[in-house]
Design a protein with these regions (language model features):
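Short S/T/G/P-rich N-terminal loop/turn motif that feeds into the first structured element of a domain
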Residues: 1-43, 48-52, 61-68, 86-92
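Short, intrinsically disordered, mixed-charge
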Residues: 68-75
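Conserved short beta-strand edge segments in small beta-sheet-based binding/regulatory domains
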Residues: 75-88
Length: 92
């Protein structure tokens, strides 16, 4: 699978509120179980409830696979999906 960074820009304040409300009720275990398929796997999210964009790292076969995994949630955002073939992990 390829690495993708996705900027999910909320289409409205209401959509932003729905996103963060729903996200706050999901455990990491639930996300691990339900945000993965053979074609797309959610890896990590960076978000701030005060901002109109949230960022996600995905491993996926294609941008379409990410949108398919998101399902109806994809409609909350304008999804700017960029393949990132160069990854440098210098984490501690």
């Amino acid at each position: 699978m390829k690495d993708y960074m996705v900027a999910h820009t909320f289409k409205s304040e209401e959509h932003r509120a729905k996103h963060f409300e729903a996200s706050s009720q999901l455990t990491l275990e639930y996300m691990r179980e339900h945000m993965k398929s053979d074609n797309a796997s959610f890896q990590m999210n960076w978000g701030n409830p005060d901002e109109m964009v949230t960022y996600c790292w995905w491993k996926a076969e294609s941008p379409a696979a990410i949108l398919s995994m998101l399902g109806e949630m994809a409609e909350l955002y304008d999804n700017d999906i960029k393949e990132m073939p160069m990854v440098a992990n210098v984490a501690d």
